[in-house]
Amino acid sequence: MEVNKLNSLVELFFEKLNKIDKEKPFLKWLKPNKSTYTWRQVSERIFKLSNKIKSIIKEGDRCLILSENRPYWLMTDIAIMNAGGISVPIFTTYSSNDYKYILNDCKPTIIIVSNNDQFKKIKNFLNPETKEIISFEEIDHKSLLIDKNF
């Protein structure tokens, strides 16, 4: 594999995927239970999420990721790029004003959060451009009651 002939991280991932034993470990998460993800598992999750994203966005649309560092973060980033979106990663430690500014500035078509705690940080700053909110973990339905005073 000649890395200098590849144009993106997505190409690099799929080039490697086509050449490697898909049952080999790709990611290992030390928390909470030292989970290991094989190349097959990771690629299946990337394809599934990428297809979902493609069904919602146009090429070049922004997709915001608000998550702690975890395996799904990497899978999400690759899925967004594979779908033709632009990843907008934001830290979980920003202030409310930071979240408000970023959401207003980037106007993401999709927001992907890791869990209910992260969703609560941004729910009051959603805008009409956001068509879908995806979460790695289940979100409390009460959290979805959003006051959209635009």
Locations of the language-model features?
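N-lobe entry segment of adenylate-forming
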Residues: 1-61, 78
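Conserved residues at the C-terminal ends of beta-strands
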Residues: 28-30, 109, 114, 136
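ANL superfamily adenylate-forming
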Residues: 31, 35, 120-150
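Nucleotide 5′-phosphate-binding alpha/beta core
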Residues: 41, 101-105, 110, 137-150
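Conserved acidic residues
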Residues: 61, 109, 131
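Short beta-strand elements of ligand-binding domains
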Residues: 67, 90-91, 114, 131-141
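Conserved ATP-dependent adenylate/AMP-binding module captured primarily in the ANL superfamily
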Residues: 92-125
